[in-house]
UniProtKB/Swiss-Prot annotation:
Forms part of the ribosomal stalk which helps the ribosome interact with GTP-bound translation factors. Is thus essential for accurate translation. Homodimer. Part of the ribosomal stalk of the 50S ribosomal subunit. Forms a multimeric L10(L12)X complex, where L10 forms an elongated spine to which 2 to 4 L12 dimers bind in a sequential fashion. Binds GTP-bound translation factors. The keyword Membrane does not apply. Keywords: Ribonucleoprotein, Ribosomal protein. One of its GO terms (biological process) is translation. SUPFAM superfamilies: ClpS-like, Ribosomal protein L7/12, oligomerisation (N-terminal) domain. This is Large ribosomal subunit protein bL12. The gene is rplL.
Length: 121
């Protein structure tokens, strides 16, 4: 009489952690394989979920106070008056690209205080 997969799973589920570790070691030795390879493959997708380090600040809208938004854009980007005005009027537009999270959040806060609608991507 052979043992079914369900019986094996139930037996492993009833084992202590130390017993499972010993079982894995014995299986590695018996079949000449390593359980570490399976762990490395499973860990691969987790690396893709790294936290983003560079952000883009997008001006979505200028709100009611266009002059204040232009001043805020000039201060943040170092553009001249005409360039800043053109950028603000072309919203939605990227203000800064590839900046750190802290810089992006600070820029977003200053522009929102001026009345702009801003998105950080």
């Amino acid at each position: 009489m052979s043992i079914t997969k369900d019986q094996i799973i139930e037996a492993v589920a009833a084992m202590s952690v130390m017993d499972v570790v010993e079982l894995i070691s014995a299986m590695e030795e018996k079949f000449g394989v390593s359980a570490a390879a399976a762990v490395a493959v499973a860990a691969g997708p987790a690396e893709a979920a790294e936290e983003k380090t560079e952000f883009d600040v997008i001006l979505k809208g200028i709100g009611a106070n266009k002059v204040a938004v232009i001043k805020a854009v000039r201060g943040a980007t170092g553009l001249g008056l005409k360039e800043a005005k053109d950028l603000v009027e072309s919203a939605p537009a990227a203000l800064k690209e590839g900046v750190s999270k802290d810089d992006a959040e600070a820029l977003k806060k200053s522009l929102e205080e001026a009345g702009a609608e801003v998105e950080v991507k």
